Structures are given as C-alpha cells and as structure tokens.
Amino acid sequence: MQGLAVSCQLPPAAAAARWRPRASSSNREAVLQCWKYELSQDHYLGGPLRIGQSQGSLHRHRSTNFLRPAAAAISVEQDEVNTYLPKGDMWSVHKFGGTCMGTPKRIQCVANIVLGDSSERKLIIVSAMSKVTDMMYNLVQKAQSRDDSYAIALAEVFEKHMTAAKDLLDGEDLARFLSQLHSDVSNLRAMLRAIYIAGHATESFSDFVVGHGELWSAQMLSYAIKKSGAPCSWMDTREVLVVTPSGCNQVDPDYLECEKRLQKWFSRQPAEIIVATGFIASTAGNIPTTLKRDGSDFSAAIVGSLVRARQVTIWTDVDGVFSADPRKVSEAVILSTLSYQEAWEMSYFGANVLHPRTIIPVMKDNIPIVIRNMFNLSAPGTMICKQPANENGDLDACVKSFATVDNLALVNVEGTGMAGVPGTASAIFSAVKDVGANVIMISQASSEHSVCFAVPEKEVAVVSAELHDRFREALAAGRLSKVEVINGCSILAAVGLRMASTPGVSAILFDALAKANINVRAIAQGCSEYNITVVLKQQDCVRALRAAHSRFFLSKTTLAVGIIGPGLIGGALLNQLKNQTAVLKENMNIDLRVIGITGSSTMLLSDTGIDLTQWKQLLQKEAEPADIGSFVHHLSDNHVFPNKVLVDCTADTSVASHYYDWLKKGIHVITPNKKANSGPLDQYLKLRTMQRASYTHYFYEATVGAGLPIISTLRGLLETGDKILRIEGIFSGTLSYIFNNFEGTRAFSDVVAEAREAGYTEPDPRDDLSGTDVARKVVVLARESGLRLELSDIPVKSLVPETLASCSSADEFMQKLPSFDEDWARQRSDAEAAGEVLRYVGALDAVNRSGQVELRRYRRDHPFAQLSGSDNIIAFTTSRYKEQPLIVRGPGAGAEVTAGGVFCDILRLASYLGAPS
C-alpha cells in the first residue's frame, strides 16, 4: 500500500460539490471528524512489536557487522525470527534532492550513479521532483482558501508525474506506477474536497498530502533501477522513521524505535538497493508528519546513522561547499574538507551547506558526509568529517569560510544598574523567549554595563515592546538607561576549527574590515573559538564579506591593477603582463589582476580582471567614457582584492596631481611619469609625507633611465650610509641616439629627422632638444639625494635655437632646422679635432647643492663617449666610489624597456607585500 488510508468514507466529489457547510461549529466539527484517519501499527511492522530492556545495550557483532542484542537484554516479538539488519561499511547512503530528481533524464542519471556505486548495499533517499513539494503545499492552501482552482493544480501534479513516468518507464513497471498514481490522486482529490468544504486542514493532514511527492519519486527511481536488472526495493519512511515534536517547528528522531522498525522492514525486504522517501516520517502515534526544513538531508543522516553507513553523500547542483557565497564573492573556492563543527557553524550562520540538525545523527558515529554535484561527477566535492585535512597552509587554513545573515536588528540594553545584579540577563532573555523571538547572537561587556543581542528584524518590534514593558520601573528609576534598537544589521561570521590555535586571526580579520572602511557594531566569539562573529550595517555586508574573504583566501600578493594611459608604454606593459601573469602566479604566487584600463577618452572596467589577451578589442567594444574619478573609485571600492595599485603610464601633469589623494585612499602608486617628483617642491614633500603616513608604496624607478636601476642604486647607496658627491649622466635616450649618430657623415637635422621617424623623440622634437626632460630627471635625483631643489634651480642650455622656439608646429621646426646644420657641424669638428665627442648631460653637484644641464665635450676614451644607440649612462661619485665612479649603463629609451622598468616596480611592490624573493 503506497498511501495512507482514511478511516471513514469520504463524500463523493459530486455530492460534496452540492453541499456547502453553514458557518457553524457543529458543521465544521462534523467535517473535521470525517478527516480522522488511523494507521494500524500492524500495517507498519507486519505485527505488534514489543521491546523490553533489562540492563544490556545494543552491540555490533565484529565478525558479521550485524546488530545483535546483548544476551537477555532485548526481546523482540516479530513474525520472522533470527533476521538481523546488517550494519557498517557495507552501506553507502545517497540523498538526491528535488533538482536532481527534476526530470526523467535526471532520474535516469540518478539511477546510473546508484548503479555505479560499488558498495555492497546502498540506501537512496530522494526528495520529490523539483517544485512538487511547493505544488502540494499550494494544493492544500488553495483548498483551505476555497479556491476552486485546486482541482486544476492537482491535475497539473498528476500530469507532471504521468509524463515523467512515460518517458522513464515502460511495460509492466509503467502500468504499476500509473495505477498507483491514479489511485493516490483519486484519494487526494477527495481529501482536498473535504478541506475545501471545511476551509481548514490540520498540520498532519497537510503533511500527509504533501508527502505524496516523495512517494512518487521514490517509486519511479526504484522502477528505473530495476530496469537494469539490479534488485531494488522502495521504502515509505513513514513506516520506519518515528519522530517527536521538539518545539520551534522541529522534530527529534526516536532512534530506538526507528531501529526496531527498520530491522522489521528489512526482514521483509532485504534488497541490496533500497530507495527511500526523504522528508516524511510519522509520530509515535503513527500520524504522518514531516522532518520540516531540509528534511530530506535529515532523513539521509538519520538512516545513515541507523545502518552505520560508510558515508552519506548529499547530491546537489553545486561542486561542494564554498568558502563564501559565490553569488557575493566571485573568488570563493570549493573546500575539500570541513569538520562537523565547522559545517555546523556555517549552517547556523546562513551558509547553504546543510541544516545544523543534519550533522547531529552522523556526528555521533563519525560518519562522513560528502557534498557532490550530480551534474559534474568529476568534481570531488566537500567531505564533512571529524578530522578534516588542512586546506591552504597554516594561517590560511585556520579560517575555512565566511557566512552572513541579513535582515537583523541589534538590541542594546544598557545601564549602570545592571552591573553586579544577578538575574538581569536572565530577565532580558526571558522576555525575549516569552514573545517567541529567536536570538542569533549575544554580546556582553565585561563590565556588565550593557548587553546586546541580534534578532530577526521582523521580530524586533515585539522584543522591544516587551523589554520596555518588563523593565519599565528600572528605566524610570534610571537603573537602565536605555533599550536601543538598531535596524538594518547583518552578521558576518568567520568560521574555522583551527582559529583557536592560531594567533593573530582576529587582528587580520579586523584589519581587513578597517581597510574596507567597515564599522563594526558588535563582536562575539565563543570560548571554543570556532567562529568570530561581527555585527555591521547591512549595506556594508557584501563589502565586508569580500574584504575578509580576500584577506584569508587570496594570495597576500594578489594585486588589483589599474593602468592609466594604454599608449606606447602602457600598451607594452599590458602585453608584458599578458605574457607573464600565469608564470608569476604559478612560480611565485603573485596574482596580478588588471581590473581597469583608462585612456584620455575611454576606459574599460572589470570587477575580477580583464582578459589581457584581448584588451585592445575590449577597450574598443566595451569601453565607457573615461572619467578619472570613477576609474579610481572602481579600484578603491573593489574589496574582492586586498591590495590595489594605480600605474600611471602617462606624462600628464594633471594625472600626477592626483597621486596624493590616491595614496591617502590606501592605493599604491607606480609611475614612469616624472611630473610629480619634479614638480613644485611643497607638493612633492606633501606627497612623500602622505606616502609614509598611509603605509602605502610609491615607486617610480622608470622616471630616470627607463628600465635601468638608477633610483634603486641611489637608494641603496644612501641607505647603506654612503654619501653622494656628484651624479653625472646622459639621461635622455633620444639625445643619446642623436649625438651617438652625429658623426660627421650626416647633417644634424637629418639625424634628428631620423630619430623622429624611428619614434625616439616626442611628436615635437623640441620637447627633447629643450633639455627640460633631462632637468626633471636631475631634480628627481637631487630630491632623492636629500636636496630640496626646484626645477627652476637647474640651469638648462637648450639645443633649440632661439629663433625656432616660436615655431607654430613641429613640422615648421623641422623645415627650418637645416639652417643651423653648419653651426652644429662646426661644433662637432672642433670637438673631433681635440679628440673629443659631443654629449648632452645632466649633472648634480651634491656638495654645492646645485645642478645643470648642458652640452659637454668628452675625450673618446671616456665612458660617456663609448655609448651606442639610445643608451643612457649615469656615473655616481660618492665617498666610497670617489676614485672611480659607480657606473650604470644600458638602454634608456623605448616603450619596452620603460614598461619593463614599471613591471619591475610592480614586482617590487609584490615583494614588499609578501611575495617570495
């Protein structure tokens, strides 16, 4: 028998349709009496079962893995004697939810998974087909509301299962299932009609109606398994699972009674594969009921405990348990293992893992639960067990996951009269209990001056009213100063078994929240230290979750990068990042994510990282109008990544003027742009002060010498106690190229034109020939050496003839430049006659605190005369390198080498943040 029998004859549908109850209690009672049904215990157990216990207990027989009663301990009267329920590792328990059972194709996939399990015995718990439970509840609700459409809704339920069965089954199995389906639906139609007439249904009656979804899905799966030739039985768990109400809409299993009934059931149907209904059970009085929320998972855990299964596998549509809600944190990862306590804490604080009560039955027998994805069998899933493996190393593994609870209110009870007064906390929470509110978290100051607790926002009004009423006298007398309610709160919980043994976890968590500008309203931590719970504004919750998760789960050297100026240097940098990012992540655990690229007119933004293999195409197709404020806000407001850096690849003064504000926001800055370090001295000093105060990094190696280690060499000398006497060098790659190639065979103007065509000069060569760029580099080095010089303090001898400085365009300048070729030829000839060459240099005299930029002559054996191409050369004369200067030489111009210098600064930043050297 598949359904539960009603003990009295229900009125035929036609007769019931003609009859309408009067609004009288006697009529209502008459109809309610009609619903009463009684289940025979004989139906469940095949005969009365009596159990008497003296002093023994149940023991597992070691050799056979059967459950055997201790001698004279238990006597069981049943029809079959000497029939024992096998227990232990031979059993594997699987649970498939409604999504897994949603279609005939999926039910067949479930059957294939079951058949692929090599366990000796398998017990399969199934939910109703997807959305059927809601449909069944809706049937009862419609009937209670006297909505005639309940009949149409019932027909839809019937059609759904009939269609599924026809797609899945055939032959005699299909006929049997459809016959039972017709019978059950006919009974349901009569029962719903009775509800319609009375306008009311008891909870047990509703549970009986709703439970049919599980009955039908279990039968369909058992028939599908039988098609393969495997022996299979199906179990109505109302015959086995006995529960008692425990308050708060919960039930507790009666394990002893469940064990007796399961043993009796198995004596009649000892199949190797058992398909059982989830969610439904019965009371001790054999009244149908349900296991409430997440009941099917609970069913699997109870049955797994009863048979001492090897493991319980919960099949879902996700790959396992995430370290955080992946809908809120895109970087959430699948956890391979969790402890029972961690899973319980996560479930309590809202993580979609398991209901906390699901863990209790298996926890006492150390039975692991595995969460797996039916739609991705290659994913190993998450194992919940007693002793989980470490995930990511020491500190990273101490926090396993983060969970949040929204829509809460914080209630704060405060007053000097609370301190040292016994019973105050008891009175507070007694009042909360009396109104039936659920306390999520409690925090009390050690001074006993205040206590606060979080409750669901929908319950806070009655809680507040009850507290004001209960403590009216104390409030009036001033013993309590206030009962305050703060709405719009959320809880963020960090969960981890190893938090108790790992120093510094709280510091890391609160540092992450502080850097995300999150204000914490309350804190709680149990003495077990399995979790740290903080209460914060609900509007800050997602930002807090991302910030905390990134600190513990992303690499310490995960950098969110924003690139300003995707031109020659910026474009070269992006291509270098594209080619090297994967290598850095694999070899050095440096994770670079470019989440923004902006030019002067358009910008491209991403929350998690731009695909650098097609950044140019994306910048054209998906870009939005450029706005430097919005661009920086996008970077600073992204709390997925713990560290942010802005890379300015422009030569723009207005962009450089923002460095101070970016550093103040906690954003690191890297740039080859000289404008900030050679600009007004007061602004430069303000910038450096902010950089130190904000604990951010400001790197600018490529401002002098492109990719050459000029700044770092100078810093190394100064930091080790050396004293700078003089710095002299050829700082311009453009001018180095021009004078290295001006050897007398070609006119000066021709060499300049060649350099312009090769891309060595600025669009207007006067910007290079003026010497201002070299002067800026001298100022950068002077300030790095501790000299407070302005750009105006550096005399510059420009190479631009005075009469050509006013040319309206670069083309006009290039047309008129040949008129000065004779002058340049004469200077070159004079130098050559003296065995010298012309070189344009910048010089810093640290002793006299002065600098200059000019054209000089050097002997052919001088290092400055040995250059080729666009090489730079810088000579450091110091107290240690006084007789023979320290020389740094190499290519000093070009997008690739400059971008390489910027890239080195990015890696230097990663090293400062914790990357291995």
UniProtKB/Swiss-Prot annotation:
Keywords: Amino-acid biosynthesis, ATP-binding, Chloroplast, Kinase, Lysine biosynthesis, Metal-binding, Methionine biosynthesis, Multifunctional enzyme, NAD, NADP, Nucleotide-binding, Oxidoreductase, Plastid, Repeat, Sodium, Threonine biosynthesis, Transferase, Transit peptide
Keyword Plastid among record annotations: yes
Residues that, per the record, bind NADPH: 569, 650, 674, 894
Residues engaged in binding L-homoserine: 762, 773
Ranges where the record places region Aspartokinase: 90-338
EC number of this enzyme: 2.7.2.4, 1.1.1.3
Lineage top rank: taxon: Eukaryota
InterPro entries: AceGlu_kinase-like_sf, ACT-like_dom_sf, ACT_Aspartokinase, ACT_dom, AK-HSDH_N, Asp/Glu/Uridylate_kinase, Asp/hSer_DH_NAD-bd, Asp_kinase
Residue segments, region Interface: 339-563
Cofactor note: A sodium ion is seen in the structure; a metal ion may subtly affect the relative position of the nucleotide-binding region to influence enzyme activity, and could increase the stability of the enzyme.
Region (Homoserine dehydrogenase) residue spans: 564-917
Protein name as catalogued: Bifunctional aspartokinase/homoserine dehydrogenase 2, chloroplastic
Source organism of this protein record: Zea mays
Origin organism lineage: Eukaryota, Viridiplantae, Streptophyta, Embryophyta, Tracheophyta
Record gene name: AKHSDH2
